[in-house]
Amino acid sequence: MSLAIRAATPADGGLVFALVRELAEYEKLSHEVDSSEHDLAKVLFAPQPRVFCDIAEWDGGPAGFALWFLNFSSFRGRHGVYLEDIFVRPALRGKGIGKALMTGLAQRCLAQGWTRMELAVLDWNAPAIEFYKSIGARVMDDWKICRLAGAALEKFGQKQPVHGA
């Protein structure tokens, strides 16, 4: 039994999209996926990408992925990582694959001088919450995620700017 973690390549576009769809199904959010394989490939494999993906392979086959991008802390004056997605196929859970994906990303943070890793987890996903706690992550109950998207974003974005303020 062997585990390998590697950066996604353009040849992985279909795989990354399939894993995103599997994650959405697990999270009961399939109805939210409106991206395409092309959309993901365009950002992941751009000449200067801003979004990155690591693929986990178990015995040479795809086992999971981590999709992430840089964020920034004005308090620390440095970048960090926002882990947008992490997913291990259900049949392969419990083998340390998710932990290996997280460890690789943590090592990259340390090597680059980035100060933290952040992620969001659904409140019903107790196994994931316990896993994050077990590796030292703090669940920040005093913060809430706010999202402006879709029609609300369009409506707000079309407001006229305030002049002379």
Model-derived features: where do they sit?
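A short beta-loop-alpha structural element at the N-terminal edge
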Residues: 4-16, 29
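Conserved acyl-CoA
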Residues: 89, 100-116, 138
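A short helix-loop-beta-strand connector motif used in the catalytic cores of GNAT acetyltransferases and
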Residues: 42-55, 82
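Glycine-rich acyl-CoA binding loop
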Residues: 56, 94-99
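Conserved GNAT-fold acetyl-CoA-binding loop/helix
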Residues: 17-43
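Conserved beta-strand in the GNAT
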Residues: 55, 61-70
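A short, internal acetyl-CoA/4′-phosphopantetheine-binding micro-motif in the GNAT/acyltransferase core
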Residues: 86-93
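C-terminal "cap" of GNAT-fold acetyltransferases
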Residues: 115-116, 121-165
